[in-house]
Amino acid sequence: MSLCATTIEPGKLPEGFNPEKIEQRKLVESFPRGGLPNFYAKLEAGQDVTIAYFGGSITAQNGYRVHSQKFFQEQYPNVKVNAIHAAIGGTGSNLGAYRLEHDVLKYKPDLVFVEFAVNDSGTPPLGIRRSMEGIVRHIWGDLPNCDILFVYTLTASQLPQMQPDVMQRSASVMEEIADYYAIPTIHMGVEIVELERSGKLIMKASNEGMTRVSGKELNLSADNFVNADGKIPFARDGVHPYENTGHILYMEAIKRSLPAIKAAGQKGPHANLPKPMVADCWEKVVTIPFDHPAVHITGPWRKDPHDDPVTRPFLNRADDFFSFDSGAEITFKYKGVNAAAYNIIGPQGGVVEVSIDGAKPYVSRQFDPYCTYHRLATMWLGNSTDPEKIRTITIKVTDQPIDKRAILFDHNKPDFDKNPAKYEKLRFFAGCIFIVGEIVE
């Protein structure tokens, strides 16, 4: 493992830069770059700080997120280190760019940990660039004194693409963004790769898969720090580290990296940003509730009360939620790069049809193999190749039947068999519309 500084000049695109291609980076544990000078300046001055942990289910675990907050608090016992849990399992930087204002910026953090390399692993390079650069520019546009730290995790399935000693593709794309904006990065998986290759660690310690990507099931501990065969068990599923093994290794990487990061950079606002690496990055996002005057709805629907059993658990992610039954139709117009709905999928999920500018609709099923429970998701409502053109979006909730039992994973089918009534309804639940651009009245 090594700590080294990047030689690429901030604000300058790499030679031959192509946003649709990936140049895989050497596997290095940390690049301090511009450091976290504003964050550390507040700590050294004895001022309270707030850290936002922004990512997917690995960040949602009681792992490196909890360990690092505790570490900072122990290092600076005379200040209050506050933490914002802004992680949602099974989601990537695309939803991250949309929900940034509600889940992170309104708390005015001093530091944002950004962890999306695993959940962005299947996203094309241009998609990662649009959302991750949008996150960076949105943070600094609203909070110029907030520092940002990219952290990378890994999974068993990503190890083959990290041969011989390169970062996985998603992290490599994020490194280019970090270079351009002088953002420090920590790859928390370097030691894990070394231990696995030397036969001292097993990535997947059980044949059991995860049935949920949220909630208490994520927070598991290994029975032993070392298995009977002498190997460290990293995770049950090869993805979500055990709290007392994999996440400890992640935290050790953070500890090793922080001294050089602390020494880097100069205090001051992240102002006068260079032009975007990609012109259509998702920097300017607006959030529109479904009862907005410019959103037209017909058919059966309601604004759910805050004690609704399905939507209540998600009120920390949106101000309100709405439910639409079969026959409901939603129409709105927008101008910009794209639009999406912040929806909930689960046992009651039905089938919706989405039409753009009156074209043949595409089908979006609000149910998947995990859906023994309800969880947040994002429903794509289309891109626009011309951000100045007004687009009309129509969402129809159909009564099309779904063979939900057939869709569920085999280990989830018993839940259907015991509770068939739980799956009978066909509904569409959503909290708001995200637009990279603006809504048109």
Report each predicted region and the residues it spans.
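Substrate-gating cap/lid alpha-helix
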Residues: A156-E191, R197-G199
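A short beta-strand-loop structural module common to alpha/beta enzyme folds
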Residues: V79-T91
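Charged helix-capping and loop-helix junction motifs
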Residues: G127-G134, M167-A171
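The substrate-binding groove and active-site-proximal loops of carbohydrate-active enzymes
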Residues: G89, A117-G127, Q158-D165, H240, ...
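Oxyanion-hole/transition-state-stabilizing segment in secreted/luminal serine hydrolases
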Residues: E44, A52, Y64-V66, S93-R129
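N-terminal secretory targeting modules
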Residues: M1-F54, T59, R65, Q73-V79, ...
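Solvent-exposed loop/turn segments at secondary-structure junctions
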Residues: S57-A60, I88-S93, V118-T123, C146, ...
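A short helix->loop->beta-strand "cap" motif at the edges of active sites that frequently abuts
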Residues: G141-L149
